[in-house]
């Protein structure tokens, strides 16, 4: 997929295809509701057939992703062809999601350049000009988990960045 490093991901449609999920993914794996899974809602860690059945009862389309066991990820916001903010999101204990809305915490420590470059290259390759990209480091590599066109602004607030002013300045400078 555009040479973007990402966890193995597959979409399954219909009853016949859904029956093939466990042929392609062994638990644990991540299952997402394809639309509307914002702020960590609609994202499930599937550990057994019962949890898979519960998930499948919620959606006609199964969006399945390889589970990478990490305790934190990086949110990189790209606007107008440049990285404007990046921060760590740390998952609460016994939770695989690091979303702030799911109890995750925000850390403003420096983000590795390799992660910033992956996010920027992903945004440019996909022609996204206002996106929050979630990245993790696993087994020595960086992976893009997902991209969010409607990303939270709490990271800006905690960093003391006025998001509205940032957008206004970028518009005035014709950066976007």
Language-model-detected regions and their locations in the chain:
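A short glycine-rich, hydrophobically flanked beta-strand micro-motif that places a catalytic Asp/Glu
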Residues: 128-139
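Residue-level signal for tight coil/turn positions that link beta-strands
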Residues: 26, 80-81, 139
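Phosphate-binding site of ATP-dependent enzymes
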Residues: 41-126
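Protein kinase-like catalytic core scaffold
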Residues: 29, 82-85, 131, 143-145
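Active-site nucleotide/adenylate-binding loops and adjacent lid/helix of ATP-dependent enzymes
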Residues: 1-71, 113, 117, 173
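C-terminal active-site "lid" helix and adjoining low-complexity regulatory extension at the edge
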Residues: 110, 137-176
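Anionic group-transfer/hydrolysis microenvironments
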Residues: 34, 67-68, 77, 134-136, ...
């Amino acid at each position: 997929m555009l040479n973007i490093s990402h966890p193995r991901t597959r979409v399954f449609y219909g009853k016949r295809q859904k029956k093939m999920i466990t042929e392609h993914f062994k638990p644990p794996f991540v299952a997402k509701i394809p639309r509307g899974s914002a702020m960590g809602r609609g994202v499930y860690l599937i550990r057994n057939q019962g949890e898979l059945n519960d998930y499948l009862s919620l959606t006609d389309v199964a969006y399945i992703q390889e589970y990478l066991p990490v305790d934190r990820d990086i949110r990189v916001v790209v606007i107008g062809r440049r990285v404007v903010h990046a921060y760590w999101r740390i998952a609460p204990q016994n939770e695989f999601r690091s979303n702030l809305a799911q109890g995750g915490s925000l850390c403003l420590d420096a983000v590795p350049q390799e992660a910033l470059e992956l996010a920027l290259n992903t945004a440019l390759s996909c022609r996204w000009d206002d996106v929050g990209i979630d990245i993790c480091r696993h087994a020595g590599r960086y992976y893009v988990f997902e991209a969010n066109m409607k990303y939270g602004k709490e990271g800006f607030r905690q960093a003391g960045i006025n998001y509205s002013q940032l957008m206004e300045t970028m518009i005035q400078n014709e950066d976007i």
